[in-house]
């Protein structure tokens, strides 16, 4: 269906066909979920019974709605292997919650300020300096980010927000890491292994390195410290599959954000890796491991 048309969905369908697996695409908003039934958690999709799959690959990521998260939990309750689980997806979806969890574990993150009301300019200047970034707590594809290069731009933005009928409370303010301006490193992890890395560069004159925003990509060496940091970040959030974005700060690598359903068109272009095949192989291994651990019925 046109509703499911995307590079990633097409690649998953190709990989599943090569492996002889049945892959069915589902829109979580079209589900009806039932609890308290004798058969346990059940579901209807577009009015028809929809049995729990062996594996659910959750690909809604930062765009996950409450319904999408509910479907993930529902399928997990019904016995499906869910990659990634709802709690991990929800944490990664919230950039502030992600930074809090990483910082609490001692992992390097950019200096960040968050408050319910608009921050004091003096606080931002003292803690972050200029230029800085204002970011939505939930966002993707480089959207929801504003750069302030000087005090005038910052005052203008704060004035605009102050005059808004609904003052946004889902903003956090972050230092702009000058040494990584317009570039970052994306590491993809599957299971507890980093499978590859790419360097992302912003388009000329831009500062957002997202491939979806017109940036360029290139292969990046997956050095052990880089891989270890990405794997630890994904593990702290409980993610089986993740795209970990790292900034090259003067004092070392910093984790910018962690994505639970990373797009991989640019990643495959840069690395030559078959991401759907790697993910489906991992899912099959997880299913086999679960079957081996399941208690055998006595005759």
Language-model features, listed with the residues they occupy:
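ATP-binding N-terminal substructure of ATP-dependent carboxylate-amine bond-forming enzymes
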Residues: 1-83, 88
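A conserved helix-loop-beta module that forms one wall/lid of the active-site cleft
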Residues: 21-27, 72-144
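Short acidic-glycine loop/turn motifs at beta-strand connectors
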Residues: 37-39, 189-193, 249-251
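Glycine-rich phosphate/pyrophosphate-binding beta-alpha loops
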Residues: 62, 141, 259-271
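Protein kinase-like catalytic core scaffold
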Residues: 132, 172, 195-196, 242, ...
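Phosphate-binding site of ATP-dependent enzymes
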Residues: 146-234
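A short beta-strand motif that forms the metal-chelation/ATP-contact edge
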Residues: 187-189, 252-266
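A long amphipathic alpha-helix within ATP-dependent nucleotide-binding catalytic cores
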Residues: 206-255, 276-297
